[in-house]
Amino acid sequence: MADTGEVQFMKPFISEKSSKSLEIPLGFNEYFPAPFPITVDLLDYSGRSWTVRMKKRGEKVFLTVGWENFVKDNNLEDGKYLQFIYDRDRTFYVIIYGHNMCSEYRDFPQVAVEVDDYENGEEEEDGDDQDKHQ
């Protein structure tokens, strides 16, 4: 019976080699399904997603088109490490580790939500307002 669990690898980010594309370790190729996927999704801890094209060059596999967006959006710089957890269904969950080797979590803009001060959607009667309208 085939193993269907997650598999993973880590890569250091080296801008000279990894800004435009990222080479996936050769030993990882056995985990890709046939037919070979044209694209994969990269997901971060917050659920943000990037669709990235995969390209084979001989035995080597690279993340190409779309990878630059991931690099830019995550402010990747030399010395950070990336952990890729593959679900074997075209999705990599990516954890970014900083220079201190601790995982990085970024704050993203929050949408302001207006909270209704009234219960059950009905306005409360205010004695002062009643006096003004009488």
Curated annotation (Swiss-Prot):
Gene3D superfamilies: DNA-binding pseudobarrel domain (2.40.330.10). One of its GO terms (molecular function) is DNA binding. The keyword Transcription applies. Keywords: DNA-binding, Nucleus, Transcription, Transcription regulation. The keyword Protein transport does not apply. InterPro entries: B3_DNA-bd, DNA-bd_pseudobarrel_sf, Plant_B3_domain. Pfam families: B3. It is found in: Nucleus. Residues 7-100 bind DNA. One of its GO terms (cellular component) is nucleus. It comes from the Eukaryota. Putative DNA-binding elements conserved in B3 domains from the RAV, ARF and ABI3/VP1 subfamilies are largely absent in At1g16640, suggesting that B3 domains could function in contexts other than transcriptional regulation. This is B3 domain-containing protein At1g16640. It comes from Arabidopsis thaliana.
